[in-house]
Amino acid sequence: MLRQFFSYYKPYKTLFFLDFFSAIAGGLMELSFPLIVNYFIDTLLPGRDWGLIIATSIGLFAVYALSSALQYIVTYWGHMLGINIETDMRKSLFDHLQKLSFKFYDNNKTGTLMSKLTNDLMYIGEVAHHGPEDLFIAVMTILGAFGVMLFINWQLALLTFIIMPIVIWLALYFNKKMTKAFTTLNKDIGDFSARVENNIGGIRLVQAFGNEAFEKERFAVNNQRFRVTKLSSYKIMAKNGSISYMLTRFVTLFVLLCGTWFVIRGSLSYGEFVAFVLLTNVLFRPIDKINAIIEMYPRGIAGFKSYMELMETEPDIQDSPDSKDVSGLKGNIRYKHVSFGYDDHHNVLNDINLSIQAGETVAFVGPSGAGKSTLCSLLPRFYEASEGDITIDGISIKDMTLSSLRGQIGVVQQDVFLFSGTLRENIAYGRLGASEEDIWQAVKQAHLEELVHNMPDGLDTMIGERGVKLSGGQKQRLSIARMFLKNPSILILDEATSALDTETEAAIQKALQELSEGRTTLVIAHRLATIKDADRIVVVTNNGIEEQGRHQDLIEAGGLYSRLHQAQFGQMVHR
């Protein structure tokens, strides 16, 4: 894990060494102060040479000025190093998340992933700056201070250093406990973020059902668990801090008592005694730094472990080494003995065989859960078939690059996702870099002109979080405009009009028919009236493809489609 962590320093070697050696130089200057005080008391005071005293004072001031400059470098440039590494890691993680399939997101909470991208990486950034530097300098300062102490009085130095093994043992002990505590804390932060994200994202549903009290109770459970975990980690920190404080102050008292005895015996001068006490304080500073590391390291370690677990999650759907870019596909689709299950225990689709001709409109109907949407989701490789193969124009979709395959397929869903931003940005998402002329052409084709002209800022009107300022029909038209701009060879309409009123549905259907012209179109619908003009209707059940044919042929066959049609239109007449 350390090798993986330090690999992120490679692009910033110069910055790392600037920060590292500045911190080392600053630490060495700290050691010089007690020696200069010793020189003042034992040499300059008895000699009463004001010229030498002033010269030494100026030299000490220069040391302090240089130390201040080094402190600035360590604080600013050192944090720049940490921020750069944090930024690189966040970019790598975000890029990696773009490669993961729908299956991964089906099994992971959005709030947890958000926490990994934000909180975890902030802790890692702090460790990247302070970690190696602080640990090395702490050890170096302790050894340097001990060396000077030995030079002044080796007996007192050895007596003072007896306490160090206890301090080191405590550091290792509390570091282990803190790592465990912060691993749990990071998980709780993820759950906490997921709860808040769910509530805020679904606030309209919460208020519509009047379930605010229920949501408060659920939030209180997560909030309390987060509180308890955080308190337990701070309890460990408090124990570590208080015990370390007691030990270091005991050492100070010990040095004062023993040092006084050595002075009275005449084996230690006054200047050496004061220098020794000051060196004891220099010795404590890295111990305090080690305590800070004990608090910081576990957060960073837990965050980095979580980061690496996510980075090591291999995309289950990715380009094969021999995959090639495709363009200008006609849209001849063939499913050959295709099976698929969302888990290893149950298949949604079993041994599906289906051929679709280029330019053909094929509608999929059947009971919920039979696999209609799943069948279509396998085509752009949102999910991977567990058995069999799917080809387009005779080429296996596994032999096409994902970007070029998905560039040839457009999906219009019932639940349209829109980004926070303007109408223009959401339409242009269909083809990044599209010209103004192309965007307006798509607006006209989707019958969005009236909406755009009625908006206060036209195409530059902000539509709110996920398009909250637009109606369902307006969202659908915007989605269709986006698809006109993309201009795919193959179109998937996933229950695109099932939640709209009759008038809006008719307008959307007209736009969809225009969009479907000349394209291979796969339609998933519950409302059979919308697909009676399809070239072919495929009835999908839990047993696979039950029957297929044109609307009238299936009605006359008296099979499942006929019964579904009779049940649906019988209900409509009854109503």
From Swiss-Prot:
It comes from the Bacteria. ATP binds at G366, P367, S368, G369, A370, G371, K372, S373. It is a multi-pass membrane protein. GO terms for biological process: transmembrane transport. Residues 333-567 form the ABC transporter domain. Residues 16-299 form the ABC transmembrane type-1 domain. Gene3D superfamilies: ABC transporter type 1, transmembrane domain, P-loop containing nucleotide triphosphate hydrolases. The keyword Ligase does not apply. The chain crosses the membrane at residues 16-36, 50-70, 132-152, 154-174, 243-263, 264-284. It is found in: Cell membrane; Membrane raft. GO terms for molecular function: ABC-type transporter activity; ATP binding; ATP hydrolysis activity; ATPase-coupled lipid transmembrane transporter activity. The keyword ATP-binding applies. GO terms for cellular component: membrane raft; plasma membrane. Belongs to the ABC transporter superfamily. This is Uncharacterized ABC transporter ATP-binding protein YwjA.
